Amino acid sequence: MLNGYLPHFIADTLRESKTKLIHMSTDCVFAGNTGPYYEDSFPDRMIFYDRSKAIGEVNDDKNLTFRNSIIGPDINEKGIGLFNWFMKQEDSINGFTGAIWTGVTTLTLAKAMEEAVKQNLTGLYNLVNNESISKFDLCILFNKYFRNGRIIINPSDKLQLDKSLRHRRTDFSFVVPSYEQQIKEMAD
């Protein structure tokens, strides 16, 4: 309930002020069976969390909802994100070649938020670079920039899922860098 209600409550509370809500949604609003997904694609995932995130998307002419997936360091050492998981691995792992991803690093997200405020971006925007990468290839980049190639990454096709996001909007000049650029910048 909180994911669905709170963003709209905050937006309503801010209605008469100059303050803008920047809300984060997720690619999890989609089932992953028919990607890529655009801003106007119907959120078809039926799990409670995913429905609550879809309901919470604020799409109006004052506030902004960025829909994406993020990777990056987590202040919680027990964090469950892909990057934290990868950094805890010691020997070899399986990388899913059929799990397709289109997210941004937390550093890129912060830069995009700053630029969105400057450009007064509103509505719903899929914050992606309009390219896809497999979780296997993403782990290859983590390995290259964070582990000096020490982890053996075995390709696995056991998971087939495409939650790729794409954007069609042309009113935001921020350019999301390539995945390699984002991961390299995160490592620097």
Segments the model singles out, each with a brief description of its role:
Residues 110-162:
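Mid/C-terminal beta-alpha module of Rossmann-like enzyme folds, strongest
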Residues 5, 24-47:
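Active-site "gating" loop of Rossmann-like NAD(P)-dependent oxidoreductase/epimerase domains
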